[in-house]
């Protein structure tokens, strides 16, 4: 029987930016280490606070790999893969390197408001 790895204090990591609008990877590393040192039970990456809709695929990949590299399997990681475009969500899921990621956080399409059948198919 599978155990629920996502329990306790889950931290939705923010994506820090430099004043020029670039992802601040040194600051991201400090944030991950801070949470590891201060009692987090799992990470949620690239969700709303992680600015996923505003990031390129390359930035999301590098953020994912940076968090995995620092975490080294110590805490479970939940990765956000969601949006209104089902095809794009499926492509992101296929594209992601899932080694070191323990689950997917997704959402129902919120803009185009599909039917129940549409939600099921999404």
Positions of PLM-derived features:
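Active-site beta->alpha loop and helix N-cap motifs at the rims of alpha/beta catalytic domains
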Residues: 2-122
């Amino acid at each position: 029987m599978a155990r629920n790895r996502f329990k306790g204090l889950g931290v939705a990591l923010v994506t820090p930016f430099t004043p020029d609008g670039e992802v601040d990877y040194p600051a991201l590393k400090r944030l991950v280490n801070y949470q590891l040192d201060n009692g987090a039970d799992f990470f949620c990456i690239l969700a709303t606070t992680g600015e996923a809709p505003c990031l390129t695929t390359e930035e999301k990949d590098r953020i994912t790999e940076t968090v995995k590299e620092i975490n080294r399997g110590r805490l479970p990681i939940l990765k956000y893969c969601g949006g209104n475009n089902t095809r794009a969500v499926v492509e992101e899921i296929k594209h992601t390197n899932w080694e070191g990621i323990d689950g997917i956080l997704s959402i129902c399409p919120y803009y185009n408001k599909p039917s129940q059948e549409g939600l099921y198919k999404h």
